[in-house]
Every structure is written in structure tokens, then in C-alpha cells.
């Protein structure tokens, strides 16, 4: 089994809609086992720009993380599907040992 993690910003868009929503819908259409989306309260990336949620932030671009655990073949298919999407984020995979599913 593989873990796919995708880090992106809350403001990242695809066809005018939130990118994370597009990615979840695409994963669903491809029959992925499941996707979890996390919304961070604070973080920074390789550009070292701090993103955070507080009262004074009028328009925060908070970190969004998608996690998918699935068979390697499905992860690779999903990666090919999203390869042409341009966003400023991080995508990586890792081998995982699933102890329990379902």
C-alpha cells in the first residue's frame, strides 16, 4: 500500500473552483479507497511565507493536506491524472503498512 500526500493552499484553484475539491472528486471518480482533507491552522512552505488563521488575517491562504492510502497502481494512476495541474505545493508518496482498514 502507498500513502499519497498533497500539500496545497486553500486559495489554489482549478477551473475557478477550489483545487482540493476537484482532487477529491477526481479521486472518487477513479475509485480510490478514500481521501481525507485536513485544513491547517498555520504553516509555511518553501517560499517561507507564513500562513495562519487569526482575527487579523482578512484572507488567509491556509494549508490544505490531502491524504490517500491505496494500492500503488491506483496511486500512480491518480498521479498521472493530476500531473498537468499547476499549483505551488508538495506531492509525495510513501510506503505504508496498513494494520486495519474498514
Swiss-Prot record:
Under Pfam families, the record lists: DUF190 (PF02641)
What InterPro entries does the annotation carry?
Answer: N-reg_PII-like_a/b, N-reg_PII/ATP_PRibTrfase_C, UPF0166
Transmembrane residue ranges: none
SUPFAM superfamilies (UniProt xref) = GlnB-like (SSF54913)
Superkingdom is Bacteria
Family, similarity comment: Belongs to the UPF0166 family.
Its protein name is UPF0166 protein TM_0021
Q: Taxonomically, what lineage is the organism?
A: Bacteria, Thermotogati, Thermotogota, Thermotogae, Thermotogales
Amino acid at each position: 500500500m502507498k500513502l499519497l500526500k498533497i500539500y496545497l493552499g486553500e486559495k489554489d484553484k482549478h477551473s475557478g473552483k477550489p483545487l482540493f475539491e476537484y482532487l477529491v472528486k477526481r479521486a472518487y471518480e477513479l475509485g480510490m479507497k478514500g481521501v481525507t482533507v485536513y485544513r491547517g491552522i498555520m504553516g509555511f512552505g518553501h517560499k517561507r511565507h507564513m500562513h495562519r488563521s487569526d482575527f487579523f488575517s482578512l484572507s488567509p491562504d491556509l494549508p490544505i493536506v490531502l491524504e490517500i492510502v491505496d494500492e500503488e497502481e491506483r496511486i500512480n494512476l491518480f498521479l498521472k491524472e493530476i500531473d498537468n495541474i499547476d499549483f505551488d505545493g508538495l506531492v509525495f508518496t510513501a510506503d505504508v503498512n496498513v494494520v486495519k482498514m474498514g
